[in-house]
Amino acid sequence: MPLITNVIARQILDSRGNPTVEVDVLTETSYGRAAVPSGASTGVHEAVELRDGDSGVYLGKSVMKAVMNVNTHINDRLKGMDVTEQVEIDNTLIALDGTANKSNLGANAILGVSLACAKAAAEYSGLSLFRYIGGTLATTLPVPMMNVLNGGAHADNNVDFQEFMIMPIGFTTYSDALRCGVEVFHALKALLKKKGLSTAVGDEGGFAPNLGSNEEAIELVIEAVGKAGYSVGSPTDRGGIGDAQVMIALDPASSEYYDADRKKYVFKKSSGKELDASEMAEYWEKWCSDYPIISIEDAMAEDDWEGWKLLSDKIGSRVQLVGDDLFVTNTRRLADGIDKKVGNSILIKVNQIGTLTETLQAIDLAKRNGYTSVISHRSGETEDTTIAQIAVATGAGQIKTGSLSRSDRMAKYNELLRIEEELGAEAYYPGVKAFRV
């Protein structure tokens, strides 16, 4: 029986130079390490990331309280437990914290421990993490959402919407799909240079030029796909995917420009336009008729259930509508959405909920109710590649892990290449079959 002998946490730095938590879990015969990501645009319903708040140390962002919680309370409680009992470990962590949002010990402390335990258990079992979690049928590589153009909270420019992404859906292998993404990324860089626009990148490695409008952003991405020699689909109400190799995905992160008091969506970075929920839903309906969009994440604000319902009724049958801030990887909020027939997909961020068990429960609930799952990074990342392993373990079929630059993003793409190699002939890339619209 692989009993936990020590749980050790330390403060490290993430891809934005901010402190985060890294945890080592040791047993008598195995070891696991996990580092915790952090978001820039965070939902109000997310589990709480515990930071010290001392403005004189790392501008208040130090995580030494969370580190100490791991090294004392959590270490004392988990010592002697069987590291392969993931559910028991996670339930113990939840009970030890004693709050609904993990604000006592910190979700960053709890998550680091939860993931490190899974890795130690996988090593003890002599298996890759994706095999340990997912079993012998874990053979599906995810279709990536590649964030090539940034705006919103992820970039200092005049684009309201946070992420403009490409999805290489017309391929039969992950490695070919990845190559497509890389070539489109470089074609976009050349296109921006030719137009005299900045090729500086945002938090997730996508370009962040100052553009005249939100429309110009998506049109540049579509143009870059063609310049790279790939075909882009049609709008989903006019033929849609067909034999296209690439479709477009968006993450507007609408909660960031939603005025909850006035119930208005305010395009404050670009035109200053103000739209109510009905007008915002119509806006997205028009975009999905004008552009080859297959997926929109957080198209409406996190608590604008009325707006979400309007949009779901309008385009939910032909466009993947992903709830991130809406569902926050939380089974209770997802169950509400399912009951209200809102959205048709959930974004899975391990640090939104705080344990591996709860993450897997959210994916399972989505799957049982016909919702897709997209495994996701955060804007503040590390070299940790756990989400790549989770994507394959769960057969989610989709992953969102940034652009084709910055080593913190490339680490996940490269890990998927290694998994594809390990799987060999068993590796399956679903392409368009990853979607249910």
Curated annotation (Swiss-Prot):
InterPro entries linked to this entry: Enolase, Enolase-like_C_sf, Enolase-like_N, Enolase_C, Enolase_CS, Enolase_N
Binding site for (2R)-2-phosphoglycerate: Q162, K349, R378, S379, K400
Job of this protein: Catalyzes the reversible conversion of 2-phosphoglycerate (2-PG) into phosphoenolpyruvate (PEP). It is essential for the degradation of carbohydrates via glycolysis.
Active-site residues (renumbered): E204 (proton donor), K349 (proton acceptor)
Enzyme class: lyase
Cell compartment(s), UniProt: Cytoplasm; Secreted; Cell surface
PANTHER family, per database record: ENOLASE
Catalyzed chemical reaction(s): (2R)-2-phosphoglycerate = phosphoenolpyruvate + H2O
Organism of derivation: Chlorobium phaeobacteroides (strain BS1)
EC number: 4.2.1.11
Entries under CDD domains matching the protein: enolase
Keyword terms: Cytoplasm, Glycolysis, Lyase, Magnesium, Metal-binding, Secreted
Family as reported in the entry's similarity comment: Belongs to the enolase family.
Gene Ontology, cellular component aspect: cell surface; extracellular region; phosphopyruvate hydratase complex
Cofactor: Mg(2+)
List of residues binding Mg(2+): D251, E297, D324
Domain of life per record: Bacteria
Pathways per UniProt: Carbohydrate degradation; glycolysis; pyruvate from D-glyceraldehyde 3-phosphate: step 4/5
Gene Ontology molecular function: any one: magnesium ion binding
Protein's name according to its UniProt entry: Enolase
SUPFAM superfamilies assigned: Enolase C-terminal domain-like, Enolase N-terminal domain-like
Entry's cofactor comment: Binds a second Mg(2+) ion via substrate during catalysis.
Alphabetized HAMAP family for the sequence: Enolase
Any one Gene Ontology BP term: glycolytic process
